[in-house]
């Protein structure tokens, strides 16, 4: 094998992309991963890390460009870790995401006949984030800086704009940055664990334009909060809620458990289809509202509701998808382990006069067995777990329920594929549709249809 040494400069042809969007060059079957390189490009790169089974390279020059290469429009792209694919055409991004799902499902497990649809993309894949979580820090000259983290670090890149955030969010960020400097408000220092302001979080209702601004603080005392509230109210009239979230933990967790309202309402509203949702500072709510409607519509297509079906919504959160389906179902039962989320789901059901819904707090595997003992037999089960996927106990319990259809939404196709192998005991994985919830990044969301085998 050809010798591979750190700091050596080499040339090669990119033959593949990793799930992180890095180009793959091979030297005698030894893989070298190079960020920002594209398939079929001839490149020059420097080896910056060499391990036994792989190496990492830094792109120096593109000798022969791919047709899929574009100039990243963001001036911070080379430094910031928020986006990974701005150097790639949007069509190529969608194709890459579908190909990753194909590789996961067609090459492992009994899923070679599963149909994998084209990725559902956006017409305009920018400015889509309805929630911005912006770290706050200080420069060496003690000026307030706000932006996003450098790749693989907690160094904040001071930014004036971000092309995937709502435009209003960057306007709020820039004004708050100015006011924090002007009022000389102390900023949290991650190393010394001292200072007050840790993060600025901004949420916007996509269809309502209501805005919530949250100051995440290291402790409850916030003496100049009234000054900031008055400035925000005056400059941004669509702000309907300003909150303080207290996080005095010495961890990377952004939000604490305790919040207080400094101005306006406790929650903002947004709509999906005909359903209105109340969203608090701590609520889980999909980041990309326009794509969420496409995701949920695809899930609804898979559910094939006629008005006669019992639907079970597991990992239901604030009831987002269950309430979306309720107008077309006989009854929706939702279960979630977070008590506040269940309260929000019940409030959202009441707000929308959806009386054919029942929500209960607890572990899904426990609650659905209780419902089973009460004679509740779901026709369709919705599954939308966190990135780690489903607990095996939950999946085996789900198999006991034996619904006709399972619609599984995932933000991590790797764990979805793992879970699918357990469900394959009784279910056929018929079809998967990738939905691009996070353009310019490597994140993939999928919705999958499982049908009980005896129904084929």
Curated annotation (Swiss-Prot):
GO biological process entries: rRNA base methylation
Active site: 411
Keyword tRNA processing in annotation: no
InterPro entries, per database record: MeTrfase_TrmA_AS, MeTrfase_TrmA_CS, NA-bd_OB-fold, SAM-dependent_MTases_sf, TRAM_dom, U5_MeTrfase_fam
GO molecular function: 4 iron, 4 sulfur cluster binding; metal ion binding; rRNA (uridine-C5-)-methyltransferase activity
A Pfam family annotated for this UniProt entry: tRNA_U5-meth_tr
Keyword flag Metal-binding: yes
PROSITE patterns from the UniProt entry: SAM_MT_RNA_M5U (PS51687), TRAM (PS50926), TRMA_1 (PS01230), TRMA_2 (PS01231)
Domain TRAM, residue spans: 3-61
UniProt keyword list: 4Fe-4S, Iron, Iron-sulfur, Metal-binding, Methyltransferase, S-adenosyl-L-methionine, Transferase
Residues where S-adenosyl-L-methionine binds: 286, 315, 336, 384
Binding of [4Fe-4S] cluster, residues: 74, 80, 83, 162
EC number: 2.1.1.-
NCBIfam families for the chain: rumA
Recorded family membership: Belongs to the class I-like SAM-binding methyltransferase superfamily. RNA M5U methyltransferase family.
PANTHER family given in the database record: RNA M5U METHYLTRANSFERASE (PTHR11061), TRNA (URACIL(54)-C(5))-METHYLTRANSFERASE (PTHR11061:SF30)
Name the record gives this protein: Uncharacterized RNA methyltransferase SE_1582
Source organism of the structure: Staphylococcus epidermidis (strain ATCC 12228 / FDA PCI 1200)
């Amino acid at each position: 094998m050809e010798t591979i040494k750190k700091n050596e400069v080499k040339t090669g042809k990119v033959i593949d992309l990793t799930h992180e969007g890095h180009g793959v060059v091979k030297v005698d079957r030894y893989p070298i991963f190079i960020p920002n390189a594209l398939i079929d490009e001839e490149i020059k790169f420097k080896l910056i890390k060499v391990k036994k089974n792989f190496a990492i390279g830094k792109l120096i020059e593109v000798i022969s460009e791919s047709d899929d290469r574009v100039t990243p429009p963001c001036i911070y792209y080379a430094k910031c870790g928020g986006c990974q694919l701005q150097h790639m055409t949007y069509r190529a991004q969608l194709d890459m995401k579908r190909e990753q799902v194909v590789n996961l499902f067609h090459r492992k497990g009994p899923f070679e006949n599963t149909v994998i649809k084209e990725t559902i993309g956006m017409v305009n894949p920018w400015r889509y984030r309805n929630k911005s979580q912006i770290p706050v820090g200080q420069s060496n000259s003690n000026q307030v800086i706000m932006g996003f983290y450098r790749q693989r670090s907690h160094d904040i890149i001071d930014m004036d704009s971000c092309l995937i955030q709502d435009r209003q969010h960057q306007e709020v960020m820039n004004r708050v940055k100015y006011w924090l400097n002007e009022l000389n408000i102390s900023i949290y220092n991650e190393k010394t664990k001292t200072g007050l302001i840790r993060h600025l979080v901004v949420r916007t209702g996509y269809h309502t334009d209501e805005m919530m601004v949250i100051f995440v603080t290291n402790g409850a005392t916030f003496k100049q909060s009234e000054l900031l509230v008055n400035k925000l109210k005056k400059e941004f009239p669509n702000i309907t809620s300003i909150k303080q979230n207290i996080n005095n933990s010495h961890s990377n967790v952004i939000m604490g458990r305790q919040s207080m309202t400094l101005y306006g309402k406790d929650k903002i509203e947004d709509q999906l289809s005909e359903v209105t949702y109340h969203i608090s500072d701590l609520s889980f709510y999909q980041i990309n509202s326009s794509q969420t409607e496409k995701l949920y519509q695809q899930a609804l297509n898979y559910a094939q509701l006629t008005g006669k079906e019992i639907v079970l919504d597991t990992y239901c959160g604030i009831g987002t998808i269950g309430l979306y389906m309720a107008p077309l179902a006989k009854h929706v039962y939702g279960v979630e382990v977070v008590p506040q989320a269940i309260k929000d789901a019940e409030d959202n059901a009441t707000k929308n006069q959806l009386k054919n819904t029942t929500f209960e707090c607890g572990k899904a595997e426990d609650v659905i067995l209780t419902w089973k003992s009460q004679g509740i037999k779901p026709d369709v089960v919705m599954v939308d777990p966190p990135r780690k996927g489903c607990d095996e106990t939950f999946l085996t319990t789900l198999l006991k329920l034996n619904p006709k259809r399972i619609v599984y939404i995932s933000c991590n196709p790797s764990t979805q594929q793992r879970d699918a192998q357990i469900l394959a005991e009784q279910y056929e994985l018929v079809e998967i549709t990738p939905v691009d919830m996070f353009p310019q990044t490597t994140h993939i969301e999928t919705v999958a249809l499982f049908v009980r085998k005896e129904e084929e």
